[in-house]
Every structure is written in structure tokens, then in C-alpha cells.
Amino acid sequence: MRGLIPDHMLERGRTVLDSYREPVERLLSERRMPEEGWPDDVIATFLWELSRMDTDKDPKAARIGEREARVASRLAEESVFGFCHGVGRSGTLVDPQPKAPGASIMYALTNRLVTDFLRRLGFRIEGAFVVPGATGLSIALCLSALGEGEEVIYPYAAHKSPIKAVRLAGFGMRVVDTEIEGDRIVVDPGDVEEALERSESPAAVLSTLTFFPPRSSDPLPEIAELCEEYGVPHVVNAAYGIQHEQYRDLLNRAIKRGRVDVVVSSTDKNLLTPVGGGIVYAPDEETLREVSRAYPGRASAAPVAHALISLLSLGMKGYRRLMRRQKECKALLDELLEDLEARRDDVRVLDVDNPIASAVAVEGHDPVDLAARLYVRRVTGPRGVRADDPFGTSRLRGYHSNYITINAAIGVREEDVKTAVERLERELEGE
């Protein structure tokens, strides 16, 4: 470029270019989550540069394989930033793919970043990787890799995804029923131990860290201790467990006290990505390697790219800011619901100890119908459960109240919370 414009102008232009290159060079060198988030155009340029390393971008290549990243539409290619070969090999999900050097770098870098991200949030782990499948599929992958017996011990939670995951992995299920303590639905560690003793061939314990109230988190430290004592793998469903310190602290106590093989969280619920990705993390890297070997075939790069985009866009500061806002919105939600309770005889805020969601008993109202009417009023997310519903209540013998749950998860806005409670009151009034 020298000689085309004056040198001082050229140097000025290089300064601008360097400002874009510098974060990329630092990322490739340090391989850590950036403190500050990146602009979208820098992220996009970085991803396209990586994807141009894949063999399907070689203009002189003779592509004669049955899988050559051919796409019918440019739109499809753009939707994955050119990573059309996907990630992984048929043997191991996290292994480099010879036809996709760029995608392999992208995947390895994403896993480095998500590990660093979790450690800096305070999780006691040795490694993590992104799975191109949401929470249920990721749980099934972990169970298929680690389970050696015939049935999974499952402290009961009203969620079809983990139940289907157990079946998909080829195991039977021994359900541990829950108990009521005040307003909370809890798991007795003694019942888990009894299930382990009665099972002739326990494959694993699938515990629950995060769930809708009034279902409480499982007693993870006690379950971890039992899994270590009985020599049974322990898989933790922490679907949205990354976004709050209460879940982190409970998980860390379990890791310190006993056996936790792997933890599964969702990328969309924690990293604000499109649905489709999971994060598997563990206190032992070899266990993660074993899980990655269980994945059948190559995988889509889209959920991995989505996770990387979110990590780079937010940075550590951006994510911590979202965590602070979530706490503020949850406090606002509780305040508004308590105010509603003080003004109405048909509403009681349940004591559930959940940092993400609140539960409200609604006397004289059908909670399922109430949640449906809120949906029509353009309030998405409330969950209505009847007291005699053995599935919805997460208790085979039912619950003492009809209730609805309202979430204030990461990414929620104050105006969302205010509008939801206002419309709830209108529906209670029958307006």
C-alpha cells in the first residue's frame, strides 16, 4: 500500500486496522474469555476468516467425497458462518476434522473459552465442551457414556426432557418420589440411598440442580457422597445453573464432598444463544473425553458458533452485568408479588427459595387456564399447575395448592416483570 497514499495517512489507517486485529490476536494467544465484549463486525470477520481455512473453500480442490460441505443455498452457508463441514470426527466429538481446520480451531477455542468462563465464575471444574444438542440430548450423551448398569436413579422432577434422555440412552428408570416441607418440594437423601440399595444394577444417578419452584434443588452434596460410596456415576442436570451463584455454590459443595461426574447446562438458558446447544463440564478432564467419544458421527457447528459468538459478544464484564440485572429483576418480581398478595385474598406467594423464579398459590382459580390466558395477553413463560397433578407438581402424591410460576431469568428486563405482574392481576380480576 505504500506509495498509494502519503505515509502518515497509511500509518493512521494501519492504526485503525490494528484496533480490529488486536483482540483477535490476543484471543488466539491467550485463549481466555475476553474481559470486554467484541463488536459484532469483529466477531463476524473472525468467524469467516476461520471458515475460509476449511477445504470446501479451496478453489482448486477436487471434492469427490460423499460429504464435501456442499450446500444448495448461500443462505444455509451464511447461517453457520461457512462452517458447513461441522465439527468432530466419527470417533470423538472434540477431535479435529481434517476437512475442517478452521471449524476445528473454532471448536477447540470455544471449549477453551467456556472452560475459562466457568472457572472465572467460580466453578470447580477442570474442563468443559459445547455439545451440538440441547440439555436433554446432552444428558442422554452423558448417560450413554458413563452408565454401565440397567437403570438410572432419578429423584422426581416434572420435566419430560431428562426422562426421555434416560430412555434414549437405553436405560430403565427408578423414580425417587419427593416430599413436602412447608411450601417446598424436596428430595430426602435417605430415599435416594434406599433406591440405590434396591436397584440390582444402578447405571447412574441423575440429579436436578435447577427447576421450577416449588421443586427445590436436589441435595447434591449428600447425593454426591452416596454416589461415591456406592460407586455409581453422578450426572447433574443444571439446565440454567450457570447464571446464579446459589447454584454454583451448591454444585461446588457437591464436587468437594463426593462424586460428580458431569454437569449439563443449556447454552440458550445461560449464554443467550438460539436453542440447540448444551455445555458439559466436569471436575475431571478424562470423563469429558469419555463423553465426547460417545457422540455418534460428526456434528453441526451452528450451536458451537452460537456459543462462541455469545461469549465474545458479552465478555466477562457483560455477563456479570447480566447476572446483576437478573438479581435486580428477581428482587423486583418478589416485591411486586408480595404487594399483590397484600392486596388480594386469592394470592399467596410461596416460600420456595429459588433465585430465578417465584411461585404463587392462586385460590379459586384454575392455574392452567390462568397461565393460558396470560399467554393470550402476550405474557410468555408462566407455568400453571393444579395441586392434584402428579407430574406437574414434581410429586407423585400431589401438592397442597394450585399455583403458577413466573421467572426472572438472565436476560429479563424490568418492564417484562412489571407488565407480567400487571397482566396477572387483571386476569385474577377477570378483566
UniProtKB/Swiss-Prot annotation:
Please name the InterPro entries in this protein's record: PyrdxlP-dep_Trfase, PyrdxlP-dep_Trfase_major, Sec-tRNA_Se_transferase, SepSecS/SepCysS
Keywords assigned: Protein biosynthesis, Pyridoxal phosphate, RNA-binding, Selenium, Transferase, tRNA-binding
UniProt GO MF annotations: O-phosphoseryl-tRNA(Sec) selenium transferase activity; tRNA binding
Q: Give me the residues that bind pyridoxal 5'-phosphate, please.
A: R67
Gene Ontology biological-process annotations? conversion of seryl-tRNAsec to selenocys-tRNAsec; selenocysteine incorporation
* Residues covered by region (Phosphate loop (P-loop)): 88-98
Q: EC?
A: 2.9.1.2
Q: Where is this site: May act as a substrate filter by repelling compounds with a negatively charged alpha-carboxylate?
A: E66
Report if keyword Transferase is assigned: yes
User: Where in this protein does the record put region Tetramerization?
Assistant: 1-36
Q: Name one Pfam family in it.
A: SepSecS
Q: Does the keyword DNA-binding apply?
A: no
Q: Which residues carry this modification: N6-(pyridoxal phosphate)lysine?
A: K269
Q: Cofactor(s) for this protein?
A: pyridoxal 5'-phosphate
Recorded catalytic activity of this chain's protein:
O-phospho-L-seryl-tRNA(Sec) + selenophosphate + H2O = L-selenocysteinyl-tRNA(Sec) + 2 phosphate
Q: Which Gene3D superfamilies match?
A: Type I PLP-dependent aspartate aminotransferase-like (Major domain)
Q: How does it assemble?
A: Homotetramer.
What exactly does this protein do? Converts O-phosphoseryl-tRNA(Sec) to selenocysteinyl-tRNA(Sec) required for selenoprotein biosynthesis.
As for family, the record states: Belongs to the SepSecS family.
Entry's NCBIfam families?
selenium_SpcS
Record-given protein name: O-phosphoseryl-tRNA(Sec) selenium transferase
Which taxonomic lineage does the organism of this UniProt entry have?
Archaea, Methanobacteriati, Methanobacteriota, Methanomada group, Methanopyri
Gene symbol? spcS
